[in-house]
Amino acid sequence: MKRLLLIGGGVLALAVPAAAQAVTPNDPLLPKQWYAPQDKAFDAFNALTFLPVVRVAVIDSGVDVNHPDLKGQILAARSFVGGSPADDYGHGTFVAGEIAAAVDDGHGIAGLAPAANLLVGKVVRPDGTVSTRAEARAIRWAVKLGARVINISLGGLRDPQDPFFTGYSKIEQQAVDDAVAQGVLVVAAVGNNKYAPVKPWKYASYPAALPHVVGVGSYGKDGDVSTFSNQDPVFVDLSAPGEDMFSLLPRTLTSKNTTCDEQGYSSCGPKEYRHAAGTSFSAPQVTAAAATLFSLDPTLTSDQVSWLLDRSATPASPDNGCADCPDGRNALTGWGKLNIAAAVRALRAGQAPTPDRFEPNDDIVIGRAIRGRRAHFRATVDFWDDAADVYRIKLRRGQRVAVAARPGANLALTVVLWKPALGSLAAAEDKFRAGRSANGAGGVDRFKYRAKENGWYSVEVSTTRPGFGTYSLRIRRSR
């Protein structure tokens, strides 16, 4: 499986007072970063002070480790495609600059996550392609080194209607699942439609289309959705600026433009970077926002951070430039436009949801084993990011089991018991179904079953319509 670059202790950080007023870093090229005020990146802060470091991974084309604006910002850099982690394309350095360029140092640009230190994994081959195997190794490396957020600004055409272009990689999903299980948030670009057979393209790329991954689309200075940005009613979660972007470039690339004074910045770079555009450069802004939330509260889970970012977004509408955006969550911008200040306020107001201790458990292979004859607990589902939960129960032939799920407000559930022979929900067919819930009194979904064979059965709880919420699940097995 190959992917392409989607081109189209403590550190100085931000203090959050009870009633914040915007701070303006003194970086001289900040005025060229139109996306910073658009994201309200510094609007929730009125001072620069010390906050805990958050490790952020950039899985990309490498990085200029000696760039002046990244001095002291890179903890580790490694190539997973041979050679050095040096950035031959510029893509990874550009992304790294958006997130973690030094802030308020009187030089260059300002990164949007002042508390971020970088772990850079190079996964781009000399021909510009990426193997998912290299990507998966880089993800696991970053998790091992303590990353809390991983930015992946790469992907390929995804067409779920065409078996030759599904874009799915089991290796990639396993690496992402492992990262989520360790409390890491993965942020990914939803992709550009450059190679799509029709435009706009209606499907987000992988890994943005995986559960628990925050998929990010692009909009321009006029506030409208970028024509190149992939759409998706489920997997576009947020939108952030992605046109006429300004950031860092390796100085080996900018030195070829000798008449330009801003060496090391995209204004001096090759043509495709002078006014860089692409969902690749939208995702890092969300990554930076996530890093800020983790720095303010290291106890947050990845799903709590994604929820805060999603629900604090500014809804996109014709009033703020999105001509075709309908009310509510939509396929063009997801929950809306990134609003970092609003996310910080939501965190301070205690709006993060209760974490689900069973996640990730979105498929049979990572389903959570439930032991003991009786179990009763609460968990959550999210139609857009966590539509299904799987619990594994061991039954003997002839043993009886009763399952009952009570949905919270605004939730509609289906509960299915799958036979031991089914290895993945993606392969689910009627022949594997052992039982299915029937909606009973009080809205409770329930069923009873007597096992016809020994083995590990799978209880799937899924939401059947758009919504987010908590449910209670009760499982009782006979002796």
Q: What does each model-identified segment do?
A:
Residues Y168, D303, T333-G336, H376-R479:
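Acidic, Ser/Thr/Pro-rich low-complexity intrinsically disordered segments
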Residues F42-R78, G83-R133, L145-R148, A209-H212, ...:
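Subtilisin-like serine protease catalytic core
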Residues G8, A22-V23, K32-Q33, K40, ...:
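C-terminal subdomain of the subtilisin-like protease fold in secreted/lumenal serine endopeptidases
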Residues Q33, K40, S61-A86, P114-D127, ...:
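Peri-catalytic substrate-binding/gating loops that frame the active-site cleft of hydrolases
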Residues N46, G121-H212, D222, S266-P284, ...:
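Substrate-binding/access-modulating region of protease and related hydrolase catalytic domains
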Residues D60, V184, S205-S295, T299:
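Extracellular S/T/G-rich loop segment that most often corresponds to the catalytic His/Ser-adjacent loop
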Residues G8-A15:
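Bacterial N-terminal signal peptides
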Residues A13, A20-R55, P68-D69, C268, ...:
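Protease zymogen maturation seam
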